[in-house]
Amino acid sequence: MARAVGIDLGTTNSVVAVLEGGDPVVVANSEGSRTTPSVVAFARNGEVLVGQPAKNQAVTNVDRTIRSVKRHMGTDWNTEIDGKKYTAQEISARTLMKLKRDAESYLGEDITDAVITVPAYFNDAQRQATKEAGQIAGLNVLRIVNEPTAAALAYGLDKGEKEQTILVFDLGGGTFDVSLLEIGEGVVEVRATSGDNHLGGDDWDERVVTWLVDKFKASSGIDLTKDKMAMQRLREAAEKAKIELSSSQSTSINLPYITVDADKNPLFLDEQLTRAEFQRITQDLLDRTRQPFQSVIKDAGISVGDIDHVVLVGGSTRMPAVSELVKEMTGGKEPNKGVNPDEVVAVGAALQAGVLKGEVKDVLLLDVTPLSLGIETKGGVMTKLIERNTTIPTKRSETFTTADDNQPSVQIQVFQGEREIASHNKLLGSFELTGIPPAPRGVPQIEVTFDIDANGIVHVTAKDKGTGKENTIRIQEGSGLSKEEIDRMIKDAEAHADEDRKRREEADVRNQAETLVYQTEKFVKEQREAEGGSKVPEDVLTKVDGAISEAKTALAGTDIGAIKAAMEKLGTESQALGQAIYEATQAEQAAGGGAGGADGSSSSSDDDVVDAEVVDDDRENK
């Protein structure tokens, strides 16, 4: 049975984990790190870089480097590079493809199945887009799981039979969730969830960038926001400063040659940022986490004192101000320190993959829908069929009627959100039920059914009870991709994977050829410069010289076939040279051995060959 992995597809970093003997293991990437930056870059030579290599070259390739694309999932965002438009799904798929490759390399087998996590507060369009990204990357997405639920699963499975209430506070690079869960006897049940899809560590970084821009403008009069390269350097410095301030009271931000003045003199940026100042400029961001926390406590119908454990998830929770706020809001409860906030979500996803594959037994995951679902009814009102925090999968039906006499059709508009007026919520999709027989208003019976699957993806059916006629919609308009577009993107991704493989193979062939040329050239030179002259005839060396020259010519070109052929020829000539040297050495030793037998001084010959495999033969010959 093929293995399934768990993937935390993050805004700033992503992680992949797999079950090994029933235990989850976080897989290190090809660079040796357990987290992979969610950064994709298109190099000017056509190569696509993903992860740390992409992040490393961001300053010199600003316009062709894409980060934090998770914030655009489920929207019509796209970016154009070399005349081709890329959607958020395609960019995310690049990160997923790298994680898939790294996991395959670790396991030594192909991977097709995955559980991918999303913020609990992701709407239907964002979930659908995440699933599409997985498909483009060549993955069969077994399940879309909420990040806090995955974290609770990873945290809570070994906590015994006693039922416990766990609060998961998840502040990542671009999204924020807070969820309340109950765990006991192998059941993980989400009681309530809330959050903000546009709040995360990136926002803290931007505040530091703005602070630096203002400071530099005040001292030099130059506005760095007009310089893309300078802004990229500022973002990287801001992220580094934020991380340092989690363990230090102050940090130095020193960026030499950040720009030049009117006289083309280089200017330096050198600022000292204290933790107190950092907390002052980001206080309002921190305060935005309070309302979702209070909503969850209210929706779950519990008091703060009922919380048994607090789990912090996401790298941004390492900021001291965040953990202090959580402690304050939970009545002084210390957050659990035994969980790695960067890895726990991927670990939970791997466990859920194990549950779905039958590798992990006796675990039941009961997740919830984060937002209410309903349709627009007369007067533009949002009529909710499924309330937020309803356990999924779920199915609800309600009967509606027509608003006008002899109305031949009804338009069903599906919305997600908490506002009373439908247009203030997110329109997920719409469809029409036609062919309703003429009748006075209020007579036709139209049954509308909402069905949410375990991934949190919505299906809606409208049925005329009188005629039995029905129409169904699977909500996917929000992601902006049709099946044809997804199929095209999958083919594109596969083509690029072949290109990448080809490029790697070409690089390997070049490296092998260059190494062979260098070693052979060195060998020939040593022979010619040897004391007493070369042991082999000059015509053998000349043949090798010719093969070296051919290999160098091939390496100067772009034809990999020619390089392979030249390398093969050079390999053959090198072997002939090695054979000639071996035979010459043997002949020399044989002559030396004969002389040694005559005068009784053969010890030096034996010393020369003491480590060689031919020693015993040599002694037998004597």
Swiss-Prot record:
The reply to whether Flavoprotein figures as a keyword in the UniProt entry is: no
A Pfam family of the record is HSP70
Q: Which InterPro entries match?
A: ATPase_NBD, Chaperone_DnaK, Heat_shock_70_CS, HSP70_C_sf, HSP70_peptide-bd_sf, Hsp_70_fam
Keyword annotations from UniProtKB, A to Z: ATP-binding, Chaperone, Nucleotide-binding, Phosphoprotein, Stress response
- In Gene Ontology terms, what is one molecular function of this protein? ATP-dependent protein folding chaperone
> Ranges of Basic and acidic residues compositional bias?
494-511
Positions of the UniProt region annotated as Disordered: 494-513, 588-622
Q: Tell me the residues on which Phosphothreonine occurs.
A: T175
> Which superkingdom heads the taxonomic lineage of this protein's source?
Bacteria
Asked if ATP-binding is a keyword of the record, the answer is yes
Q: What drives induction of this protein's expression?
A: By stress conditions e.g. heat shock.
Locations of Acidic residues compositional bias?
605-622
Family assignment from sequence similarity: Belongs to the heat shock protein 70 family.
Functional description taken from the UniProt entry: Acts as a chaperone.
What this protein is called in its record is Chaperone protein DnaK
From which source organism is this entry? Mycobacterium sp. (strain KMS)
The UniProt gene name for this protein comes to dnaK
